Amino acid sequence: MREVVSLNVGQAGGQIANSCWELYCLEHGIQPDGYLTEERKAADPDQGFNTFFSETGQGKYVPRTIYCDLEPNVVDEVRTGPYRALFHPEQMITGKEDASNNYARGHYTVGKEMIDQCLDKVRRVADNCSGLQGFLVFHSFGGGQGSGFGALLMERLSVDYGKKTKLEFCVYPAPQNATSVVEPYNSILTTHTTLEHSDVQFMVDNEAIYDICRRNLGIERPSYENSNRLMAQGQSPITAIMLLFDCALNVDLNEFQTNLVPYPRIHFPLASYSPVVSAGKASHESNSVMEVTIVCFEPNNQMVKCDPRNGKYMATCLLYRGDVVPKDVHAVAATLKTKRTVQFVDLQPTGFKIGICYQPPTMVPNGDLAKVNRACMLSNTTAISEAWTALSHKFDLIYSKRAFVHWYVGEGMEEGEF
């Protein structure tokens, strides 16, 4: 079996993971206490569980996941929340003081004390796997723990599990709504550190997600819960097709790397997801395979604020969920190739990697989204440089005044690292 261990670092990692596990449990018919529902037991047992869940002797399913947080708030919500019986209590690791938005605290001072405990738990979970495929790491770039501790964790995973694939789902600092003033420092430092250690980094920014919620779902003031559920839906085709279900065209963890990353350092694919429609509107729209796919190429459906029309595509991967026929998908791919609106770089052939999963997407009860066939597009495009350009410009602005640098130096960094 090909298992995957997911690691959730910091507040953003923990909260996104909560939404993802809620979704995985619904998809597999696993109750919040870890046991299967009656309908699920009666149905054909599906072996896709083992990728993300390990089964105990009593028939309980335990997620292969580890929560690491330097302060206990987010993990305490899990410990007291509806899914408290699902997770193994030892796999939730919390410290007493947070990294206070400081990369150096997460990476050098506070993070150093927790990293061995964290890796010990990772080793235990990994030893339970018969064929560990790799790691999914959820964290943010802007916070102190997501950036500092996340980078430290990636470095140590590379040492201990060199050949295993490491996929990251990162919350990237949004251009307009920032949560802290030192986000550019943290993001640039963590990107520089993890560039060699990460295989693929899927970037998401909150502003793009909020815009999708406002525009397509009619939520005036989206909360983190709305955005995290949308992110979970956006990454569920990736995990479902890759691992969980028996699919027409299956994709493996290593295949993402092979198909999306032409050069090891250019590993920042853009994710886009369609259709994002509320339950009220869904019955009035046709949502054909063609429409759903073309919407994926629109700039306002990307999960990062950048315009793919300004760049060229290096590689594209189309993942479908629901009642989708391969014939339609190939017709769509042929149409896109002739259209020339989708510009590929000259050195790459215009090919689309395609995955189809017949299991329709599962919706959270009373959630925002309607149950329709979905497409998720992962593309490695040169347009992502817009996001980095904006960020490095902010970094230069703050660093030219040496603002806030003393906080980092005081925690054991050297100014030369900037």
Curated annotation (Swiss-Prot):
InterPro entries, from UniProt? Alpha_tubulin (IPR002452), Tub_FtsZ_C (IPR008280), Tubulin (IPR000217), Tubulin/FtsZ-like_C (IPR037103), Tubulin/FtsZ_2-layer-sand-dom (IPR018316), Tubulin/FtsZ_GTPase_sf (IPR036525), Tubulin_C (IPR023123), Tubulin_FtsZ_GTPase (IPR003008)
Description of how the protein assembles with itself and partners = Dimer of alpha and beta chains. A typical microtubule is a hollow water-filled tube with an outer diameter of 25 nm and an inner diameter of 15 nM. Alpha-beta heterodimers associate head-to-tail to form protofilaments running lengthwise along the microtubule wall with the beta-tubulin subunit facing the microtubule plus end conferring a structural polarity. Microtubules usually have 13 protofilaments but different protofilament numbers can be found in some organisms and specialized cells.
Lyase as a keyword of this entry, yes or no, is: no
Q: Which GO terms describe its molecular function?
A: GTP binding; hydrolase activity; metal ion binding; structural constituent of cytoskeleton
- Recorded GO CC terms: cytoplasm; microtubule
* Primary role: Tubulin is the major constituent of microtubules, a cylinder consisting of laterally associated linear protofilaments composed of alpha- and beta-tubulin heterodimers. Microtubules grow by the addition of GTP-tubulin dimers to the microtubule end, where a stabilizing cap forms. Below the cap, tubulin dimers are in GDP-bound state, owing to GTPase activity of alpha-tubulin.
Q: Which key words tag this protein in UniProt? A: Cytoplasm, Cytoskeleton, GTP-binding, Hydrolase, Magnesium, Metal-binding, Microtubule, Nucleotide-binding
Gene behind the chain: TUB1
Q: Name one Pfam family in it.
A: Tubulin
Q: Which residues hold GTP?
A: 11, 71, 140, 144, 179, 206, 228
Q: Which residues bind Mg(2+)?
A: 71
Q: Which organism is it from?
A: Ajellomyces capsulatus (Darling's disease fungus)
User: Where does it localize?
Assistant: Cytoplasm, Cytoskeleton
Is Lipid biosynthesis one of the keywords?
no
**EC number(s) for this protein?**
3.6.5.-
Annotated family: Belongs to the tubulin family.
Cofactor(s) the protein needs: Mg(2+)
Residues in the active site? 255
Q: Which reaction does it catalyse?
A: GTP + H2O = GDP + phosphate + H(+)
Give any single GO term for biological process. Answer: microtubule-based process
Q: What is this protein called?
A: Tubulin alpha chain
